[in-house]
């Protein structure tokens, strides 16, 4: 039978972050009504709150505080668990770590503190934050875990919020730093400072250790119960302190994200290779665009798109609703959910088959989520505000999301591997390391070995100066002063596919990496600079109130008042290098062209990938609209190909005239559409099994059987 999470893929969660200052709050919550709604929604694994960010509990706790709405009806939530368990559903218990407003105010010594010693409510936050380094708070968490495991019968536990919402300087953090490192905790962000880098590493280690502590508390009491930790900040800036250690503390991983369907596509691939066990879980709200809009609901097409993007990656879907403060729900939400889940259920027998197939591996470094050139600001600065991957506030995010975008639109099979699974590097036909400032020695050694043994590598920008020295014999020498630079092809080089020339070079709004020394191999492009160093911000005609910088000087020189066009003189600074190393091939770019969302840059990056692939065929391909994504799984003599139409609109228009193919050295016995198992006409030619889909709206799945 396997673990419950391998079989129960239709999940939901009802947010219950409700205070109790109003006597009506949560009084109308009825477990029978909600259970019926779950049945209507065709859910087979509900996640159920027993406590919330408020810190208030939904059971008669002895060590915490029960919500006043449950006084006199203390067993309501237990009754809901019992109803679901008796029906054959698998139940996941929700508990909030760190975000505990009730205990925050009860225990000032538990509070997270900023660099000035102020708690988080100083700035008006509703959320009270307790520090995981405080041993009294940990003891409280352990006691609560013991209580809820004794009181409720559940199949899994979901721990929310194991991350640093702020950089904490409480007494507990200061004491731990003093013990493990010594001296004052750093307060200024400086990626050139070894102590700051140590501090950054400690944030990750401390949070990973806290997550493992919570997991261990569950496992030593009920080892059969699964544990999952919120993993959303793995997509966010450095300050959240989440890396692969959170994944290792989880039986499987997942989270809720709100960056749109392209971010979800990337996250599904990243989590596929990050999770300890399949399937991963993808969560998102039914509210549009986020839970902040309490009474809005995404269109059926948007909800369906989210569910089927997850299913295309053989993941488990979880849709989030939010309870009304008095404890009621909108039953119409569950009717909509049910229609989608009844449709998705038909595909579930196929989701347990095979492994994801891809030729290109994008390397996502969970320790590289910083802007290494942005230094000298306080940890309490607004620069540390909610910076998320979809907002592209750090170089590695912009580059890797751009690479994913380009490969997806060119229907090139790609996956996302990570620094926690260096063993996956050797499986790549082509490895891409996009503008990663966080690579450590073990990863560099694994990449070197991979290339030496015949691997193909593309890396760019900030990535691994030591590899630049190893592969090309040149030394990294910082970045250009100019923050808008160009690359021009060298004589005889077609690296830019004719899209850009020496006179009209390729533009990137970034500082270019500089090197010293004579490079090994070929120089395919060189750096071209603008006529002058651009001002910190280009102030467009109507943008008088933009961020201030040094005032205008009449003698200021520029090439154009609206832009920073290239000068007529190119430099001899290498822009793109190519060399053989051992049995492998390496291409390096001084600028992360993969991160630029522009058709020419996308085409050029795809061309570089094709050049590195050489004669080896891709696992699949398509003649299809940019909005069509293909995902392939292989299980022995069967290949399962999913197509997703990524139009992120309220109402999706069908994709038309789509031709897709999978590579094979033999003709198939049959090609069938799923889940109806109807035969599909195909052609087998030139090592490809081709099918044609006249039109489809959002999702199709096909089985190629050999």
Segments the model singles out, each with a brief description of its role:
Residues 1-56, 87-89:
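N-terminal structural segment of carbohydrate-active enzymes
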Residues 49, 155-160, 189-193, 197-201, ...:
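Hydrophobic targeting/anchoring helices
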Residues 437-516, 609-610:
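A glycine-rich, often tryptophan-bearing local segment used as a flexible ligand/cofactor-contacting loop or short
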Residues 93, 97-152, 161, 177, ...:
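Active-site-adjacent "subsite" loops/lids of carbohydrate-active enzymes
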């Amino acid at each position: 039978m396997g673990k419950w999470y391998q079989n129960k893929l239709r999940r939901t969660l009802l947010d219950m972050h409700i205070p109790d200052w109003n006597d009506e709050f949560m009084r109308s919550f009825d477990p029978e009504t909600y259970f019926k709604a779950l049945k209507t929604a065709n859910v087979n694994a509900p996640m159920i709150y027993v406590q919330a960010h408020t810190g208030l509990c939904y059971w008669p706790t002895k060590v915490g505080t029960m919500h006043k709405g449950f006084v006199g009806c203390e067993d309501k939530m237990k009754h809901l668990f019992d109803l679901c368990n008796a029906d054959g559903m698998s139940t996941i218990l929700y508990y909030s770590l760190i975000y505990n407003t009730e205990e925050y105010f009860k225990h000032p010594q538990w509070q997270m503190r900023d660099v000035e010693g102020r708690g988080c409510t100083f700035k008006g936050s509703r959320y009270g934050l307790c520090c995981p380094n405080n041993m009294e708070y940990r003891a409280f968490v352990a006691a609560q875990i013991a209580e809820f495991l004794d009181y409720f019968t559940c199949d899994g536990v979901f721990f929310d919020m194991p991350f640093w919402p702020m950089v904490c300087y409480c007494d507990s953090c200061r004491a731990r730093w003093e013990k493990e490192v010594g001296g004052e905790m750093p307060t200024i962000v400086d990626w050139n400072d070894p102590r700051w880098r140590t501090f950054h590493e400690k944030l990750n280690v401390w949070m990973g250790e806290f997550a493992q502590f919570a997991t261990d508390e569950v496992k030593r009491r009920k080892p059969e119960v699964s544990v999952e930790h919120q993993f959303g900040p793995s997509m966010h800036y450095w300050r959240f302190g989440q890396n692969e250690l959170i994944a290792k503390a989880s039986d499987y991983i997942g989270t809720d994200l709100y960056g749109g369907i392209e971010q979800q596509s990337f996250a599904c691939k990243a989590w596929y290779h990050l999770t300890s066990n399949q399937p991963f879980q993808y969560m998102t709200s039914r509210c549009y665009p986020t839970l902040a809009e309490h009474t809005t609901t995404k269109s059926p097409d948007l909800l369906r798109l989210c569910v089927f993007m997850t299913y295309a990656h053989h993941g488990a879907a979880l849709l989030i609703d939010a309870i009304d403060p008095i404890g009621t729900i909108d039953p119409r939400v569950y009717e909509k959910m049910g229609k989608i889940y009844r449709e998705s259920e038909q595909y579930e027998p196929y989701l347990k088959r095979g492994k994801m197939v891809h030729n290109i591996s994008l390397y996502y470094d969970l320790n590289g989520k910083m802007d290494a050139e942005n230094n000298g600001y306080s940890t309490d600065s607004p620069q540390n505000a909610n910076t998320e991957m979809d907002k592209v506030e750090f170089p590695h995010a912009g580059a890797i999301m751009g690479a994913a975008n380009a490969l997806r639109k060119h229907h090139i099979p790609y996956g996302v591997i990570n620094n926690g699974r260096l063993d996956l590097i050797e499986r790549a036909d082509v490895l891409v390391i996009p503008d990663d400032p966080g690579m450590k020695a073990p990863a560099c050694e694994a990449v070197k070995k991979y290339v030496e043994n015949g691997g193909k590598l593309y890396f760019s920008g900030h990535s691994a100066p030591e590899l630049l020295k190893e592969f090309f014999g040149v030394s990294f020498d910082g970045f250009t002063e100019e923050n808008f630079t160009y690359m021009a092809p060298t004589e005889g080089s077609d690296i830019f596919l004719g899209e850009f020339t020496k006179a009209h070079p390729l533009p990137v709004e970034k500082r270019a990496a500089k090197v010293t020394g004579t490079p090994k191999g070929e120089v395919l492009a060189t750096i071209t600079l603008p006529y002058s160093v651009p001002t910190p911000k280009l102030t467009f005609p109507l943008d008088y109130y933009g961020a201030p910088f040094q005032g205008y000087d009449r003698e200021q020189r520029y090439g154009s008042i609206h832009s920073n066009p290239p000068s007529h003189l190119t430099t001899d600074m290498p822009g793109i290098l190519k060399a053989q190393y051992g049995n492998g091939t390496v291409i390096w770019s001084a600028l992360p062209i993969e991160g630029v969302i522009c058709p020419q840059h996308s085409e050029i990056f795809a061309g570089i990938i094709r050049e590195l692939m050489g004669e080896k065929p891709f696992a699949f391909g398509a003649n299809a609209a940019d909005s069509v994504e293909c995902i392939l799984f292989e299980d022995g003599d069967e290949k399962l190909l999913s197509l997703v139409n990524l139009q992120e609109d309220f109402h999706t228009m069908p994709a038309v005239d789509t031709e897709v193919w999978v590579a094979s050295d033999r003709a198939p016995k049959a090609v069938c559409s799923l889940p109806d198992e109807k035969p599909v006409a195909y052609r087998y030619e030139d090592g490809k099994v081709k099918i044609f889909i006249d039109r489809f709206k959002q999702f199709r799945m096909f089985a190629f059987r050999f």
